Amino acid sequence: MSFLDRVKIYVKAGKGGDGCLSFRREKFIEFGGPNGGNGGKGGDVYIKTERNLTTLLELAYNPHIEAKNGEKGGTYNKTGVGADDLTIYVPCGTIVKKDGEIIADLTEEGQSVLVAKGGRGGRGNQSFKTHSNTAPRISEIGQPGEEITLYLELKVLADLGLVGFPNAGKSTFLSRVSAARPKIADYPFTTLNPNLGIAMHKKVSFVIADIPGIIEGASEGKGLGHQFLKHIERTRVLLHLVDPMGFKDIDAVESVKVIEKELKTFDRELAKKPRIIALNKADLPEAKEVYNKIVKKYKKHKVFLISAATGEGVDKVLNEIVKVISATPVPNVAISKSTVAVHGVEPLFKIVPLEDGRVQVFGRKIEDMVNMTHFNQLQGVERLRNIFKKIGLEKALIKKGVMPGDIIVVGQKEFEWSGTELDSERAEQPDFEGYKRRTTQAERLEKRRQRRLKKEEK
């Protein structure tokens, strides 16, 4: 399977089911009353870690993820069925980002985070029944689910990280001690992505990450250095494999110092990790001499002479690896405070003039109110108008200089403002599309009188 450590996904939670508008109509029951049920809740979207996964490749092929919608409410106060939640599985070590801010750092198996909340079901007319309104003709549309664009970044979690210059034999060592089968060839940069393997030694199991070859200048981004070095941040122990022949014009003894410098420059914490040095390719004639030089110069590190190809000395270095891993705690990677999203109290609404002359009203709650309103239901429109008045939206629009005839955009709806400031410092309500003002009792009596006059004339 190919390795992928960055991916962009689009997530949409499920929409809530619509509420039902119905009345109980049965023989011998004169005042049955409202019996419209509520809609079901839309499905939430979670991101959860799974140990068996090692790449984000599958999400790259399926970046659009959408949960199911809740079902509509029914008559006889039947509540619609809520949709099942949707879970996106990712490898351990995945960082979830939104707008450049970290919203979750999933390092342990089974960790999960809610990234998109499903919409609540719209209320049926039974829910609007009150002492003063015993037969409400109003119901709600289901609340839309949250939509969000996320960036996932994987930082490999491993007990042992294999580091070194290209062609030092890291992939050969991994294939020797585990069942992993990375690509192995006699040219540098054979490994372009981290490879993971699980090794077992003396009844101790540990995860090994084969990090692609690091070159001089990697800490400054040379040779995709940043992409490779970030995967070392969460390893517990480092095994530095050295080629006796060196790399290019850098000899084997000097190469140890170069890698140490690159680790320290990229992140000082990397240089503090326990590190074991293994001179690979022990079958080469000059290997023994180079080994003695490294032991003499780097006395603070344990140095081993091995051959990953033949297995010579591998057991000895595995003994040391198990010993060091057992004594080293799992790294606790702290997230920088400057990158953590800090959310304050969101205002109820925000008014923003648009370039085309329209006025946009933003606000999660107020947009949901509009999107959940049936504009073909008179009582629903009146309820929304009263809400606009109570939350102070009308006065705020007047203060912003909104004039009669201006278009107000809220959520997915557009309204034509017909209000003017009155002596009582109140304005008329927005003129809703398709809305007809409720007639007064005097107007209804006048219409009846007009109909009687027409009949008498005939």
Swiss-Prot record:
GO terms for cellular component: cytoplasm. Its EC number is 3.6.5.-. Residues 423-446 have a biased composition (Basic and acidic residues). GTP binds at residues 164-171, 189-193, 210-213, 280-283, 307-309. Residues 447-458 have a biased composition (Basic residues). Residues 158-326 form the OBG-type G domain. Mg(2+) binds at S171, T191. Disulfide bonds: none annotated. Residues 420-458 are annotated as: Disordered. Residues 1-157 form the Obg domain. InterPro entries: G_OBG, GTP-bd, GTP-bd_Obg/CgtA, GTP-bd_prot_GTP1/OBG_C_sf, GTP1-OBG_CS, GTP1_OBG_dom, GTP1_OBG_dom_sf, OBG_GTPase. Residues 341-419 form the OCT domain. GO terms for molecular function: GTP binding; GTPase activity; magnesium ion binding. GO terms for biological process: ribosome biogenesis. Its cofactor is Mg(2+). The keyword GTP-binding applies. SUPFAM superfamilies: Obg GTP-binding protein C-terminal domain, Obg GTP-binding protein N-terminal domain, P-loop containing nucleoside triphosphate hydrolases. Monomer. An essential GTPase which binds GTP, GDP and possibly (p)ppGpp with moderate affinity, with high nucleotide exchange rates and a fairly low GTP hydrolysis rate. Plays a role in control of the cell cycle, stress response, ribosome biogenesis and in those bacteria that undergo differentiation, in morphogenesis control. This is GTPase Obg. It comes from Elusimicrobium minutum (strain Pei191). The gene is obg.
